[in-house]
Amino acid sequence: MGKQRLNAAIIGPGNIGTDLMYKILRRSEYLELKLVAGIVAESEGLRLAREEGVATSAAGIQAILDRKDIDIVFDATTAHAHAQHAPLLKDAGIIAVDLTPAAVGPYVMPVVNLEEHIDAMNVNLITCGGQATIPIVYAISRVVPTAYAEIVATIASKSAGPGTRQNIDEFTLTTAKGIVDIGNAQKGKAIILLNPADPPMMMNNTIYALIDQVDPAIEQKITESVEEIIKEVQAFVPGYKLKIPPMFDGNKVTVMIEVEGSGDYLPQYSGNLDLETCAALAVAEKMAKHKLAAGAN
């Protein structure tokens, strides 16, 4: 009988890495979390991992490479760090699920294009704003050609840790590229806003699209397409909600999405981070299931 699970590791035990740890431990069917690695021995993330009985190391990427038993790594560090980690993981034959905006590997979105990249050795989760909004752009553009799409992701300032703040330029560029490459808009733009309101607000996303054709039948098809993709995202992100359904003003379509977090480790207002970790787990589970099935044949 072949392996039942792949051995997983997390590098980067910050907000995202720690939330992901709890999701793997509580929900994963195909992953066994073997290691959480960081670079600060006394960090909160490593302490919490030890409390859960998971091995930890402050030796960073080297700790993963030294073990020889890791099949898949979630990189929740920074875009700059992942650019250094990616070739090392590739040479070691370890699958990388990249939660930074580094975009070394292809962009993946569970409800849009994961099957195309199921055998890839490095996949990129785009950004939290991308995971929230690109499915909507895709839902519109599969009905009618979309000349331009712009997204505004507004997140609670408290949910933006140092990694998110360091990556803001990469966030806007990577999300805009994803709007074109995955959302199929001809041009894309992304804006991120950090809202300091207290109590913190839920993640809100506004999607604007300029479409090539307009008539009542197309409007109806777009509305149905958006509703359909929202149900697909909700299968792995229960807090993903349609706040304002498609509104049409000439050839401009506006949609608003709210994301409430699952509350595994992060507060519920951190829907932006929860969306990224939910998507990462959904991607890794499908990749692991595929790899395990291939190994059993």
From Swiss-Prot:
The keyword Signal does not apply. InterPro entries: Acetaldehyde_dehydrogenase (IPR003361), Acetylaldehyde_DH_C (IPR015426), NAD(P)-bd_dom_sf (IPR036291), Semialdehyde_DH_NAD-bd (IPR000534). Gene3D superfamilies: Dihydrodipicolinate Reductase, domain 2, NAD(P)-binding Rossmann-like Domain. Pfam families: AcetDehyd-dimer, Semialdhyde_dh. Keywords: Aromatic hydrocarbons catabolism, NAD, Oxidoreductase. It catalyses: acetaldehyde + NAD(+) + CoA = acetyl-CoA + NADH + H(+). Its EC number is 1.2.1.10. One of its GO terms (molecular function) is acetaldehyde dehydrogenase (acetylating) activity. NAD(+) binds at S159, A160, G161, P162, G163, T164, R165, Q166, N167, N272. One of its GO terms (biological process) is catabolic process. It comes from the Bacteria. The keyword NAD applies. CDD domains: ALDH_C. It is an enzyme of class 1 (oxidoreductase). The active site is at C128 (acyl-thioester intermediate). Belongs to the acetaldehyde dehydrogenase family. This is Acetaldehyde dehydrogenase.
